């Protein structure tokens, strides 16, 4: 992912304020509610039958935290996203058989959650930088599929 110095600074500044536990759970929960077909990868998580059940599910929250932890690692290695996510790409491709389109969907949901959480601070410029990052992460996670 190619970001300008200004974009890298904007991403780092905002990400430093992100509560990974809360935002991760909300982003994954929203993915499962907005795109219900993604729930098939999380059948072991139990109750996912209603939006409230999904958003309140402790396993969804815990996995969302884990996902955002990996995303944080990616932010520390923006110049080597494919290497950073190589093992996760292989896991999601070979063992979990996740549709790589889901990575793009989750990235876009994450951007929505950041906008909701940060309001005016999430300027169009900050959004543009984050869109580049989530697109780069989605591409890196889909790398083993090609």
From Swiss-Prot:
Q: What is this protein called?
A: Hemoglobin subunit delta
Q: Do the record's keywords include Transferase?
A: no
Family per UniProt?
Answer: Belongs to the globin family.
An annotated GO cellular component: haptoglobin-hemoglobin complex
Could you describe the subunit structure of this protein?
Answer: Heterotetramer of two delta chains and two alpha chains.
Q: Which UniProt keywords apply?
A: Heme, Iron, Metal-binding, Oxygen transport, Transport
Task: Pinpoint the Globin domain residues.
Answer: 2-146
Result when mutating residue 9 to A: In one allele
Q: Name one GO biological process term.
A: hydrogen peroxide catabolic process
The entry marks the following residues as binding heme b, namely 63, 92
């Amino acid at each position: 992912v190619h970001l300008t110095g200004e974009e890298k600074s904007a991403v780092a500044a905002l990400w430093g304020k992100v509560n990974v536990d809360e935002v991760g759970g909300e982003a994954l929960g929203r993915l499962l509610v907005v795109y219900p077909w993604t729930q098939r990868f999380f059948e072991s998580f139990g109750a996912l039958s209603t939006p409230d059940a999904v958003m309140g599910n402790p396993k969804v929250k815990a996995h969302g935290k884990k996902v955002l932890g990996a995303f944080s690692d990616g932010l520390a290695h923006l110049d080597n996203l494919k290497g950073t996510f190589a093992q996760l790409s292989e896991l999601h491709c070979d063992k979990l058989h996740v549709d790589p389109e889901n990575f793009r969907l989750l990235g876009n949901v994450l951007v929505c959650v950041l906008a909701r959480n940060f309001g005016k601070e999430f300027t169009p410029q900050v959004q543009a930088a984050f869109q580049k990052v989530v697109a780069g992460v989605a591409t890196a996670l889909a790398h083993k599929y090609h």
